[in-house]
Amino acid sequence: IVEELLGEAFEKNRYVTGRTAPAGSDTSWAKADLPDVVFRKGKRIDGVDATGIVKEMGPGDLFLKGANAINYDLDQAAVLIGHPVGGTLGATVGTVVSRKVRLVHPAGIEKSVPTDLVAASQRLSQEGPCMGDVYGLWATHGELFTEIEALAALFDIEAVPVGAGGIAGAEGSVTLSLFGEKEPLETALALIGEIQKEGPFAP
């Protein structure tokens, strides 16, 4: 999303905060040393970060935050918290709510889980052993924005998930059936074809 908003390539491996990778794998290539990306009236502004700029935001503004889990049927999104004081979400969500900023979670359908995420977050808040650096699960009030919403917004077509998973690198994939007028469908399929040529996010 950042790359598309900027309109240019950048070092994505330097814009990684939380991450999920195979157990025991080396993720030292993933950094978090690039500044937050902030736009005001369509133009990028430098020298500010999310925790600072959110105090100037209000109704009509968007705050984008990825999600670790979604439940599409219940319209829920949740973020795993791997920081002792809540990370970016912990530092901003109170201001986001009080200033009526629109919190949007862009996340792939691959993040779908068959769980009530509010109930799951309550269970995870109980004392007990935990594998990895996860302090909790934060079920938010934010809006979901998946491939379904993206295709509807860009091409005014309907996307229906009909399959998930695969082999040889397609383990996190989803299969969508698309419905709409011929021309937007053809345009969407052409773009999807280009996206499918992109390599995995790895060193």
Language-model-derived ranges and their functions:
Residues 71-74, 113-114:
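Short, solvent-exposed loop/turn segments at secondary-structure junctions
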Residues 3, 81-203:
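Internal alpha/beta core interface subdomains
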Residues 7-72, 80-85, 138-144, 149-157, ...:
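Ligand-binding beta-strand-loop-alpha-helix segment within the catalytic cores
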